[in-house]
Amino acid sequence: MAYTNQISAVVFLAVAIAPLLAEPQSTMFPEMTPECATVMPDLLEKCFATGSVTPTEDCCTDLKSATSTQVTCLCDNYIANPAVSNITGPYSKAITTKCGVFDKYSCDGTSKGGEEKKGGSSSSNGKDNGKSEGNGGRANSVAASMAMFGLLASLVFVMF
């Protein structure tokens, strides 16, 4: 009889937690406009694909002449999402600082790139360290659900 109760409790918990795990997950790649997808590869190749923190003249010229749309595209889709590309905050900061456009490209993935900052230079690394990256904390949600399931299942087994 106790074994039947344990099975029933485990099945109940599995059915109760399953809808939480079935929520659609966000995509790894951010949404990108067609303009962003066609314009950015050239700039990315000139500036960030070399692996060097010393930018070329062509790179600096392109960074200085970039429109606000291009800045927003670079910030939101590449700098703020290192999972998509290898452009990390410190690497981006090194290149944009040497080109003299750090204030223009100091962004955090919130479509605010290209806005001039008021009052002095920024010491930001180009990322918001308080945010989770990639999946918006979905992995933590799954881990918490599984931990709760394990806790409840062990309590049920101890009781019966």
From Swiss-Prot:
Q: How does it sit in the membrane?
A: Lipid-anchor; GPI-anchor
> Which residues belong to the propeptide?
136-160
Does the record bear rRNA processing in its keywords?
no
One Pfam family named in its UniProt record: LTP_2
User: Where found?
Assistant: Cell membrane
- Residues with glycosylation annotation: 86
Renumbered to this chain, region (Disordered) spans 111-136
What is this protein's name?
Non-specific lipid transfer protein GPI-anchored 28
Originating species: Arabidopsis thaliana
